[in-house]
């Protein structure tokens, strides 16, 4: 049995005090003493060691002996179970330091997604002011995206309507994760994964139709950031919004044979931008992509027999193509529209959508591109050119494929998301403007305080001062010219 004087130095999370590490039982003997585990080489620094000693529950009984249920029954070092209550929430007096492997529950989250009852800076305030509710979380160890389920679907429709302690991205809430990787560090106050924009709405690769839900009933489903997780409310669209007619697309008489035509794969970051493209008949690529498409369009227009430029649209990581459009005008490099989800696209060009269908990659994977190392057309980068023969095959598949879903099914869903994004952009710009004005005012006041006050003088006083200075300079010059040289070793007479 270890000395009781040293028992009070036992840490409650990852390791033990370096001064008492020698008293830890060896793993080979399988003996567990007051420290409840075997020797752990993962030691905290002195600062964290001292921090863990503040407010910890005592391991000593009233008579000075070791409490059995607080000593011998402890789990392995770093994974204390005594602080958990029956509901899975984390009790008071325990501190979460260090990195927790995904096989173990992170202490600040309960098994049902609930948070600690005590005050802590890890209790994030959600934009909905509702927080997470116990019982809505996933308790199994699957990987869940911020919005999508394991199949890339929309978050509001996942089983359980929530994300549990073992959910995907839960590791990013661990306090020491950023010491391992800063890739997912909070930006502008938002915790997000990968391509979350500044407004907090993640880029969606597939809408609610992917799980068989139809948003045409007027339900306003907002796929939101980690701070909002889930908000569903019913709201009718404004009267000025007109729905697109599916009859305007996927026409059976669309030509599928061409002597000359150009085809390019377009990879979008989100379906939000696809929705905007169909709605406004416009598209914008990267700077290099715009140059490439503009050159191709100008070259096609010089052909006498006509040469259309077709664009095959797909959303990154969606596993499908969503439509086919035609480039009907050159790129305007000086025009930038403001309704894209991200404000980084410069220039745009008009397009006309011919097909709006969800075509799974499995229906197109057999088409390979010789100009792209014989890779399938589904494995293409943005503005990847598709030769005429392969492009015609793609058109035939778009015509013949009996798709049951398309992005038009989620039109109202994306209309509401667009409204939310625009409102947040407006608020963001307003806050940014107020911040700039406040900083400018602070800068002016700082300069005023730094400048030493000087006595004000009139114009006549300034002129008089300049005149006196001129006279002094003139007299000094005359004196220097009348001075006689002094001989060596001679003594000058005092004036």
Curated annotation (Swiss-Prot):
Name of a matching Pfam family: YTH
Tissues where the protein occurs: Expressed in the shoot apex, at the sites of leaf formation, and in emerging leaves.
Single GO molecular function: mRNA binding
Annotated ranges, domain YTH: 261-398
Effect of a null allele: Aberrant trichome branching with an increase in number of spikes. The double mutant plants ect2 and ect3 exhibit delayed timing of leaf formation and altered leaf morphology.
Keyword annotations of the record: Cytoplasm, RNA-binding
Sites where the protein binds RNA: 267-269, 273, 283-284, 316, 340, 345, 353
Reported impact of residue 283 to A: Reduces binding to N6-methyladenosine (m6A)-containing RNAs
Cross-referenced InterPro entries: YTH_domain, YTH_prot
Localization (cell): Cytoplasm
CDD domains: YTH
Record GO cellular component, one term: cytoplasm
Function: Specifically recognizes and binds N6-methyladenosine (m6A)-containing RNAs, and regulates mRNA stability. M6A is a modification present at internal sites of mRNAs and some non-coding RNAs and plays a role in mRNA stability and processing. Required for the correct timing of leaf formation and normal leaf morphology. Required for proper trichome branching and morphology. Functions redundantly with ECT2.
Protein name: YTH domain-containing protein ECT3
Organism listed in the record: Arabidopsis thaliana
């Amino acid at each position: 049995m270890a000395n009781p004087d040293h028992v009070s130095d036992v840490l409650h999370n990852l390791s033990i005090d370096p001064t008492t590490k020698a008293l830890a039982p060896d793993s080979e003997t399988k003996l567990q003493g007051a420290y409840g585990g075997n020797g752990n080489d993962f030691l905290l620094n002195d600062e964290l060691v001292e921090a863990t000693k503040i407010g910890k529950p005592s391991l000593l009984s009233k008579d000075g002996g070791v409490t059995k249920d607080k000593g011998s029954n402890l789990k392995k070092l770093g994974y204390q179970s005594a602080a958990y209550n029956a509901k899975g929430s984390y009790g008071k007096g325990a501190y979460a330091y260090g990195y927790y492997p995904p096989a173990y529950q992170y202490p600040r989250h309960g098994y049902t997604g609930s948070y600690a009852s005590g005050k802590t800076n890890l209790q994030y305030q959600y934009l909905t002011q509702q927080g997470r509710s116990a019982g809505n979380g996933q308790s199994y160890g699957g990987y869940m995206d911020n919005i999508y389920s394991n199949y890339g679907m929309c978050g509001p429709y996942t089983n359980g309507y929530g994300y549990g302690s073992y959910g995907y991205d839960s590791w990013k809430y661990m306090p020491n994760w950023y010491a391992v990787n800063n890739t997912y560090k909070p930006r502008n106050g938002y915790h997000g994964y990968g391509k979350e924009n500044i407004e907090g709405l993640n880029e969606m690769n597939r809408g609610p139709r992917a799980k068989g839900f139809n948003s045409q009933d007027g339900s306003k489903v907002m796929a939101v950031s980690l701070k909002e997780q889930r908000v569903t409310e019913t709201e009718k669209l404004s009267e000025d919004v007109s729905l697109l007619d599916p009859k305007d697309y996927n026409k059976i008489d669309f030509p599928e044979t061409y002597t000359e035509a150009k085809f390019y794969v377009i990879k979008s970051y989100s379906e939000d931008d696809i929705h905007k493209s169909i709605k406004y008949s416009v598209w914008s690529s990267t700077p290099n992509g715009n140059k490439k498409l503009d050159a191709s369009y100008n070259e096609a227009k010089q052909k006498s027999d006509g040469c259309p430029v077709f664009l095959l649209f797909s959303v990154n990581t969606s596993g499908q193509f969503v439509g086919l459009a035609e480039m009907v005008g050159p790129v305007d490099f000086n025009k930038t529209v403001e309704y894209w989800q991200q404000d980084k696209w410069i220039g745009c060009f008009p397009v006309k959508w011919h097909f709006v269908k969800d075509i799974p990659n499995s229906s197109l994977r057999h088409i390979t591109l010789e100009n792209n190392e014989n890779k399938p057309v589904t494995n293409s980068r943005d503005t990847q050119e598709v030769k005429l023969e392969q492009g015609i095959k793609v058109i035939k598949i778009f015509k013949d494929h009996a798709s049951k879903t398309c992005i038009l099914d989620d039109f109202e869903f994306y209309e509401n998301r667009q409204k939310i994004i625009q409102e947040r952009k407006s608020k963001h710009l307003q806050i940014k403007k107020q911040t700039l004005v406040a900083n400018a005012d602070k800068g002016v006041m700082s300069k005023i305080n730094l400048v030493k006050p000087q006595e004000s003088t009139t114009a006549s006083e300034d002129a008089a001062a300049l005149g006196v200075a001129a006279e002094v300079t003139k007299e000094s010059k005359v004196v220097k010219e009348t001075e006689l040289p002094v001989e060596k070793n001679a003594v000058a007479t005092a004036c």
